């Protein structure tokens, strides 16, 4: 039996998520078929809401619904201590630990020559500006320890 076109499209869209293969995408799609109309509408509303309301913080490039984000605008945070992460979602586990009291800077990726990602594609100019224009006493690198990480760091001229 062939999968109906609309269902196949949903499977395809789910399979575009990182780490989601065809079988998982099918399970998700089949599960949605069991949703009530209200549950389906709630999912649709949540997807629309996140696309309309979530943006990048103009200071750190983390996810936010206000600008600057709650972390960057919080007066009790140590703005001299900056934790550099690769992606906005890397902030959440650090925050969950409750240990770090500084602010963040998101690179929006990591250098990967094989994927064609060089320093120009990363958020390094903004980091350099923060270092030069703010009184930053500590820069903490919380990036993935891969062989190209050392290439991601800005150097002084």
Regions found by a protein language model. Name each.
Residues 25, 74-143:
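Extended interfacial segments that mediate partner engagement and assembly in macromolecular machines
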Residues 150-157:
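Single conserved hydrophobic/aromatic residue that forms the stacking wall/gate
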């Amino acid at each position: 039996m062939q999968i109906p076109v609309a269902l196949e499209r949903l499977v395809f869209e789910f399979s575009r998520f990182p780490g989601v293969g065809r079988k998982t995408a099918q399970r998700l799609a089949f599960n949605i078929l069991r949703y009530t109309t209200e549950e389906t509408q709630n999912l649709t509303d949540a997807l629309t809401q996140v696309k309309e309301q979530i943006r990048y913080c103009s200071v750190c490039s983390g996810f936010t619904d206000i600008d600057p984000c709650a972390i960057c605008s919080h007066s009790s945070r140590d703005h001299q201590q900056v934790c550099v992460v690769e992606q906005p979602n890397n902030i959440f586990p650090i925050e969950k630990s409750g240990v770090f009291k500084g602010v963040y800077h998101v690179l929006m990726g990591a250098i990967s020559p094989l994927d064609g990602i060089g320093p120009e594609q990363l958020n390094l100019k903004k980091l350099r500006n923060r270092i030069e224009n703010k009184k930053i006493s500590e820069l903490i690198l919380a990036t993935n320890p891969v062989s190209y990480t050392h290439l991601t760091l800005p150097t002084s001229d």
